[in-house]
Regions:
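Pre-active-site segment of Zn-dependent metallo-hydrolases
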Residues: 46-51, 55-118, 122-129, 133-164, ...
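Core dinuclear metal-dependent hydrolase active-site scaffold
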Residues: 4, 12, 16-87, 168-227
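Cap/insert and terminal regions of metallo-dependent hydrolase folds
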Residues: 198, 202, 211, 221-253
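Short, well-ordered alpha-helix to beta-strand connector turns
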Residues: 89, 163-166, 234, 241
């Protein structure tokens, strides 16, 4: 994602978030309201490849869109979860299974940031691939922690527990009639094929008469994947820009 990590979006208007991460996630500090049904806070993935994670606040709920890691040469970079209250995240939406979009899921479980009944919502292929990739990531993490003489950031139990939250859907399962409900708020959501990986999807969220679309990672032009499905119109679009500075690119995977 090619956006400024010190800014976020409130229905298309850029807002300064330099101090946002220092604000505890209490009800008194919630920014979303009648005039701004969505507030989006980048927790990772801005001006970098990896650790994609967006914190979406609505009037009654808090959600994460993706929850990945960035694998460096000497260390793993996790999203910045500072200011998120324990058990305050009501659901996590995954655009696809690559570890830069899913690898920090055991961290939010370990830090007890997910509400008791919070689901992890994904397409069926993404759910299946995430089971494989997160267990593989755990083994790598255990080996690296042992080699460096450090404590583990998460455990096998965390992987097991967060995967136990997985709720998988077909691409069109989030159309009108299916929605995530938190308290008195109906958050409608829809997945559409993003053509990047088996099960990859863009995500549309809708509440309060407004809609925001997250592209996830797009494309690959693979003969083994269907074409990208056009998303609905949106008030705000969060768009991948990994190769946005190149006039041509033959493949994106």
């Amino acid at each position: 994602m090619g956006s400024d990590p010190s800014s976020g979006t409130v229905l298309g208007e850029q807002v300064d978030l330099d101090e946002k991460f220092d604000i505890p996630g209490t009800e008194e500090n919630r920014v979303a309201g009648p005039e701004t049904p969505f507030v989006v806070i980048p927790r990772g993935g801005c001006r970098q490849v990896g650790r994609s994670c967006y914190h979406v606040q609505t009037r009654e709920g808090d959600y994460l869109v993706d929850c990945g890691i960035a694998q460096g040469q000497s260390a793993v970079d996790y999203p910045d979860f500072q200011g998120i209250d324990e058990r305050s995240i009501d659901a996590v939406f995954l655009t696809h299974a690559h570890i830069d979009h899913t690898g920090a899921l055991p961290i939010v479980e370990h830090q007890d940031l997910l509400a008791e009944a919070a689901p992890v919502i994904a397409t069926r292929p993404t759910g299946a691939l995430a089971h494989v990739l997160l267990h593989d990531s755990l083994k790598i993490h255990q080996d690296e922690a042992c080699e460096m003489g450090q404590d583990q950031e998460f455990t096998r139990d965390d992987v097991h527990d967060v995967l136990g939250r997985m709720e998988t859907l077909q691409y069109a399962a989030g159309e009108v009639g299916d929605f995530v409900s938190v308290d008195d708020e109906a958050l409608r959501f829809k997945f559409g094929n993003a053509g990047h990986l088996l099960g990859s999807a863009w995500l549309a969220l809708e509440t309060g008469g407004r809609r925001i679309v997250f592209s996830g990672d797009l494309g690959g032009r693979s003969a083994h994947l269907p074409d990208i499905e056009g998303p609905p119109s949106a008030d705000t679009l969060v768009l991948e820009s990994t190769y946005g500075d190149r006039p041509q690119h033959t493949g994106f995977n």
